[in-house]
Amino acid sequence: MVLLSFNVIAPEVPIKDKHLVSEEELIKITFNGTKKIIDVLEKHFVFCTFFVEVSLVEKMPELLQLITKKGHELGILNQHSTEEEIVSAKKIVEELTGKFVSGIRQFPQFKHKSDVVKRMKFSYHSSMYFSNIFWLNKDFDKKTVYEENELVIVPDSWSPYSKLPYNDFTFQMIPLFFYKNMINNSMKGDDEYIVIYLNSWQFVELNHSKFGLPFYRKYNLGRQMEDKLGRFLLFLEESEWAVNRMKDFFF
């Protein structure tokens, strides 16, 4: 089972360049990137999970409704928010969509403990790893889903074939033919599932220097990511690897 998910989040602009990029522009980038993802998924009849960054929840009600309308799951993404802010965002999404929000994903450096997450009435926590060129420093340690304080913990997935994580950076940088081999090796092995996550901003061209992206992060953005995602979904379909929303697989 492939658990494909997307972080609905704006690109993180360096502090020295923040005055060059308006909040409206960042929201537009996030909206456009997410809309492109939804369109690609719809063409392939695939349903996924979208984790929306806390600060964007109130600013993008139409997008959240569209995600739900298209049959996808909505979760909360904690980049650096307090417990109160997360609870408020969760409530807004639930009232807006009429759907219970089961899952949360958190940036590693600002992660609330499992008992706090459970207190916020989440059912599962989807882990993520730093998405940069230094992930090679991490020792490969395969983990499976487990419970902690009655909260389902879903670890990030790594390929036993390449020792690379299935994160946004790997999908962006690795040639698709090699990525397919990673998937085949994992799925034909003893992996019950693979969690893959990408970012909405990766589906928008961000070549301007004002966004402060390192050169390797500008590679394959925008239309190239759209095409790559479409070809990847076609590969999954032809290989008969199922894709599902996270809440449907674990509950």
Residue spans of the language-model regions?
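A mid-sequence, solvent-exposed acidic-amphipathic segment
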Residues: N167-N185
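Catalytic alpha-helical scaffold of carbohydrate-active enzymes acting on polysaccharides/glycoconjugates
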Residues: M1-P155, Y161, Y179-F251
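Active-site capping/gating regions of soluble enzymes
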Residues: E148, D156-W158, Y166-M173
